[in-house]
């Protein structure tokens, strides 16, 4: 069956759709198909994941149109053209093989400098200034993997970002680490009646991380701590859930991970310890961020190189929000 979302080739990033462009296409589709979707909210959601990258917009909409994943659970949630439907389409898209992602992977293999820049951006949260004379950053822009925002290089969209994280984390070297093996061993204990127990995920991660890497120096905590948490998390949610990084809050001290799992959402702030005052500000920032996501519970994982730190997991109430704090 021909789909209105079929397109033959990818577009350049400078041809990106706006949220209103996407809404216009959805209005035309809705006039024909009458799905009952909330056009404005679905258009905004698709834009949030794709930043308007035309191939990704079209591919997501095609997955939704085909409804190949229209399980009973999604029917109860109101159909595929809903937030859970879009999240499931995103999960399928991120895990599929297509020419766009193959090109992205091949470019990383062909250009080591490009790979290094993207790794620093993703895992270390470095602020990389765009310099047209720098081969690696200029190449990243030319290929459409990143865009320029206020003079800095940022990954072009959430879908690219998650796919890139997965590419880095799926390398043989990463999958031979002890923390990854621990996740594979633990993964069946975290889901109860379809619900992901994020507190237990943090508790087990803290135990493993302290045992494996507790004697590492400050540089390790700053550069590799967040990488190892994502490496631990990924096999636990793989096949059912998805994650992405909130690029607006990512820097060298802080990374916010958003996890979608069976209709539930979790916000986990990963941060490098910078003292009590900075930590308390971080708690308040996370509480405010939970308000934005309409969540009552959030999670914080601090990588603390202080030898006198108190390792473990505890709960703390900030206003009306409950924070689950883990320290390694």
PLM feature segments, named:
Residues 1-9:
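Short regulatory helix/loop adjacent to the ATP-binding pocket of P-loop NTPases
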Residues 201-244:
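Acidic-basic catalytic patches of nuclease active cores, encompassing PD-(D/E)XK
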Residues 10-11, 18-143, 149-150, 179-183, ...:
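Winged-helix-like regulatory helical subdomains adjacent to P-loop NTPase cores
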Residues 279-283, 290-318:
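Nucleic-acid nuclease catalytic cores
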Residues 235-263:
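Active-site metal-binding core of divalent-cation-utilizing nuclease and nuclease-like domains
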Residues 229, 257-259, 263-274, 289:
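Conserved catalytic cores of phosphodiester-cleaving nucleases, focusing on short active-site segments
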Residues 97-98, 160-193:
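Short, amphipathic alpha-helical interaction segments positioned at domain boundaries
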Residues 314-328:
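Intrinsically disordered, low-complexity terminal regions enriched in charged/polar residues
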